[in-house]
Swiss-Prot record:
Changes after translation: Phosphorylated.
Lineage summary: Eukaryota, Metazoa, Chordata, Craniata, Vertebrata
Entry keyword Membrane: no
Purpose of the protein: Positively regulates the Wnt signaling pathway by stabilizing beta-catenin through the association with GSK-3. May play a role in tumor progression and collaborate with PIM1 and MYC in lymphomagenesis.
A GO term for molecular function: molecular function inhibitor activity
Name by which UniProt lists this protein: Proto-oncogene FRAT1
Amino acid sequence: MPCRREEEEEAGEEAEGEEEEEDSFLLLQQSVALGSSGEVDRLVAQIGETLQLDAAQHSPASPCGPPGAPLRAPGPLAAAVPADKARSPAVPLLLPPALAETVGPAPPGVLRCALGDRGRVRGRAAPYCVAELATGPSALSPLPPQADLDGPPGAGKQGIPQPLSGPCRRGWLRGAAASRRLQQRRGSQPETRTGDDDPHRLLQQLVLSGNLIKEAVRRLHSRRLQLRAKLPQRPLLGPLSAPVHEPPSPRSPRAACSDPGASGRAQLRTGDGVLVPGS
């Protein structure tokens, strides 16, 4: 008995494989007779669906398909499916409000990306607007109205970006929080600087005008002059030279000591102004 069951199962699998091969053969055979561009596009979409279904059948566990629902290849009547129904799996996630209501909820894990929306003005914290869609009927929510296209050009810049979850925005959020804290600290301090004393603005002006190196040299020179003014003034010492020996004068005591004959002729002046002959 078990042998008969195994043979029946193998025969059933072979029959299903033959049906799939026949379906694929019919689909490819019909593609030869097509001529218009609309039919070619429709056939390309059907071939893509067939390849996706075949890949899902051969894989052990398909994460895209619902559990327990077997996938079947399209039959010979699949060529008569209209183009709008054949391309239903490839509907973009970002739809206008009229079409977003007709589409069912998206599976969990689908990412929404607004990279193609170049007209929107976004802040520094959310440049890409990538978020994971939530499950439910409100998963495919339409885009918010663009204020920069309808209103004045500067109206959209003041809008705060919507909080979107995602690991790719953590760095941007940290940078935005740090810049916000820095702005709050600057706002709490009294504004003692004017617009001309702002170092960032002055640096930008110097870079644009090309006078950055000149300004740096001028500041270094002025700082050197300030340091020289703060130092005490000291007389400059001349160059060192050998001492010059001058001949001693005859009236000096050194000359008297050096010349014993002149010591008798030397006269000393006392405090009273009386000249006393030297001994």
